[in-house]
């Protein structure tokens, strides 16, 4: 499964590399867990890596809490996220494997999420709006 938000197709080049035969532009983000950090280094060495802003897909390495953290990033609104379990729970994550990553991403089931947005006003009267993902 890979997650993304509804978006204007012109703003979301998701998985276009898989269609035109170019290497997929992947950004690898990891939680602070040692096994996640080690996996990130191995995957970058094997598949290359780009900044999250230049990625077609963000690969999140950690557990469910880290997936929720990545979903809160502003760039998550325009880049699909493929999670691999390197945490303790992993209910939202795919099984971890270093092999065939781009094929697994291309074949993954797409899950479009529609989070609620929340607006709150603090005691000084300043308004804040955020996504409610959890």
Name each region found by the language model.
Residues 78-82:
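Proline-centered loop/turn at the N-terminus of a beta-strand
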Residues 91-134:
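Catalytic core of DAGKc-family lipid kinases
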Residues 47-56:
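Short acidic low-complexity segments
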Residues 86-89:
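Short, acidic/turn-prone active-site loops that include or flank metal/cofactor-
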Residues 4, 8-20:
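Short, positively charged and aromatic/hydrophobic N-terminal segments
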Residues 65-70:
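Short glycine/serine/threonine-rich phosphate/pyrophosphate-binding segments
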Residues 18-48:
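Short, charged N-terminal beta->alpha structural module
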């Amino acid at each position: 499964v890979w997650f993304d938000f509804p978006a204007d197709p012109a703003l979301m080049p998701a998985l276009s590399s898989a269609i035109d035969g170019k290497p997929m532009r992947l950004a690898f983000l990891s939680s602070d867990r040692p096994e996640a950090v080690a996996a990130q280094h191995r995957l970058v060495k094997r598949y290359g890596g780009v900044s999250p802003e230049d990625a077609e897909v963000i690969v999140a390495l950690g557990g469910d809490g880290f997936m929720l953290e990545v979903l809160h990033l502003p760039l998550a609104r325009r880049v699909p996220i493929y999670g691999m379990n390197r945490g303790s729970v992993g209910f939202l994550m795919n099984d971890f494997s270093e092999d065939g990553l781009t094929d697994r991403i291309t074949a993954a089931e797409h899950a479009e999420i529609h989070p609620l947005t929340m607006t709150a006003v603090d005691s000084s009267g300043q308004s804040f709006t955020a996504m409610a993902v959890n």
